[in-house]
Amino acid sequence: MLTYRITALGRVQGVGFRPLICRLAGAHHITGTVRNEGGVVTIIAQGSREALLSFMGDIRAARPPVEVAEMRVEEIAHAPLPDFRAVSSGGAARAPLFPADLGICEDCQADMKDPKDHHYGYPYTSCTACGPRYTMIEALPYDRERTAMKDFPLCKDCEKEYQSLSDRRCHAESIACAHCGPRLKGWTRERRFEKEVAMAEAIRLAKEGAILLVKAMGGYQLVCRGDRKETAGCLRRMKHRSGKPFALMMKDIDMAKAWAMLSEKEIEMLTSPVRPILLASPRRKVLPAVASRVPRLGLCLPSTGFYSLLAEGIDAPLIVTSANQSGEPMIFRDEEARAYYEAEEDIAGLFFYDREILRPADDSVMQLQGREVQILRRTRGFLPEPVVRDAPSGMVLATGADMAPGFALAGGGSLYPAEVPCDILNERSQAFFLETEQDWEELLGLSPQAVISDLHPAYLSRLLGEKTARERGLPFYTVQHHHAHALSVIAEHHLQGKSLAFVFDGTGYGEDGTVWGGEILLCEGTSMQRVGHLAPISMIGGDASMKQAWKSALSYLAAAGLPSKDPRAPLIRAALSHHVNTIKSSSMGRLFDAAAALLGLGEENHFKGECPMALEAAAMAAAHAPKIFWEGKEQDGRLLWDGRTLLASLLASHGTIEEKALAFHEAIVEMILSSAEHFGLPRILLSGGCFSNQLLLMRAREALQKRGFSVYTNEKVPPGDGGIALGQAWFYLMKNQK
């Protein structure tokens, strides 16, 4: 008889892991205990060697939402144990692992439709495989009395399910039904509703084309039909959202397949417990008021029982978007939602439940890049889980960058990145950013010993970092923007030694004080050498030109000495020649903007990346492309690629707009491949917001791999600024490791 101490790390809390272990122990005739210690599960298991090995094999093979990322095993001496049981939860001895919110599972949806089940018609049913966790937890260990469900005592039926090891709701802390759980309430301008009547009213209003304000799992959302032009247009005006696409919620996977071309992998992503917004190739056209001039359609499946019932009742795609003005913090508190409802006369009804949301979580956004999943927004389904669990020791706060606000906390060998659902342009949003970060410190039990931010001296994220460091008396560090992007890939994959990183994005403060963004970096450890980049040109407007693609185009034409019939061209040339409001830029994002504008695909970015997305959409419609000639040239020890040559060649080429758009993409791939061969390093990193371009990333990866290069990209955090805090934190930990 042997005794093993098994330590399991990963997604093992709030997902029915302890009941699963008890069932597996019984099946393998194992005695012992299982205990949750602050998100790390410790199992004492006694049995024969064969039984123990088989037992551990079944643990490793556990199906989602359980994810055992790491299992440590040691043989110990222990007195004989008579049976196997789950013992009381303990406190956290190391950096904790909190459970994430998970979308409603198929079993709970089936229960809601079964008149014989006591969960029938209940819009907030959940089990160990689904439901809220992160948004309702107060502290570890994860037990009901330390969640927002503590005010909802279990009824007899739910108590029976909670205690039964054979039930999938065993120890599901969010367990509830219509008899004991949070109640659905509905408000209209004239009446108040509850429970089934409120659900029926929500369906009736939405079916008629009304806009609803709905309390979802992680905050309030605006919901309406996606097939009504007037309704979608009204929602745009309400949100002050001129062009950014809306996502559509489909009632089930069959409806999703009718609207988008989905591979088996994309179906798996869409139906996963994360319940993300998936960007996929559209099968049919959507209303221009929903989405236009973008290569992919955002779609999702219901994440809660309420949404499942609503979508089923309406039987049409639903627009679902966060309830706030663009850039403002997501509304998640009831009093704010009621004030918002009262102020917006176009909202026909408010539908909510009487349980508090303790912290917000927006929908995650994902897409498939070839065979690889790419995360574009890492929120519900992931937060607050770490992406690195064996980092160097040290505690640090990284404050990210301004374009996609977020932060990362490090401690106990784990790295926890978080995106904050707002911008940080005003005091209210900045206060929300700091409030969220401090909440995470308390939640995770971490006390940063340093703060690290972006190198840009005027970034608000840096100013917030400096303020935090100053108020707490902590040392303050900075790291260059594109270096941090590269380090985010290195951190994810635990890479050591030299790597050649291509970091392409819209903007980032360079070490020479100019705007970088088309970077080729040699990285090793914490060192970075800029070995190549786009040739810098003088650009009008600095970072402000990010929204005005026409300025990028005219700046490039002026730099190339090419004529333009645009009536604004003389003014731009005059400003450039007199150095009025100009800055040197090597930004790849601005080169994409310039190409889109010169091909007539867009002059303004009404939302981030609009013109480059239009360029990508056009390129994906082409079957072949004219050859565009450009090449890198060595200058002052660096390999420079001149965007003026590329654009001049593009304008002189023959073909349709779509073919020229494809030619532009192929030229950027040629830049990557040729540069990789020039420097000869076998390991290539691709990061930065430009690599959310599906066509660019897929073709670049394919071309590099065909030539024998190993290619690494961001897989656990976004390639854009939403993932940059991870790289910042990694820089500090590596720089200060003992």
Model-assigned labels for residue ranges:
Residues M1-S174, A178-K185:
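Intrinsically disordered, low-complexity, mixed-charge
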Residues E75, I211, G219-P282:
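A phosphate-binding glycine/aspartate-rich beta-alpha loop in the early core of alpha/beta enzymes
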Residues E159, C170-S174, G181-R183, A401-D439, ...:
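A contiguous, well-structured pocket-lining segment that forms one wall/lid of small-molecule binding clefts
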Residues L213, G445-P457, L681-F691:
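Short glycine-rich phosphate-binding loop at a beta-alpha junction
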Residues K257-S263, L309, M330-A337, D363-S364, ...:
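Conserved phosphate-binding catalytic cores of ATP/NTP-utilizing and phosphoryl-transfer enzymes
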Residues I314-D390, V580, K584-S585:
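Internal gly/pro-rich beta-alpha loop/helix module
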Residues D454, G473-H485, I684-S687, Q694, ...:
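Conserved phosphate-binding/catalytic loops in two-lobed NTP-binding clefts
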Residues H482-F504, G508-G510, A549-A558, H665, ...:
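Glycine-rich phosphate-binding/hydrolytic loop that grips phosphoryl groups
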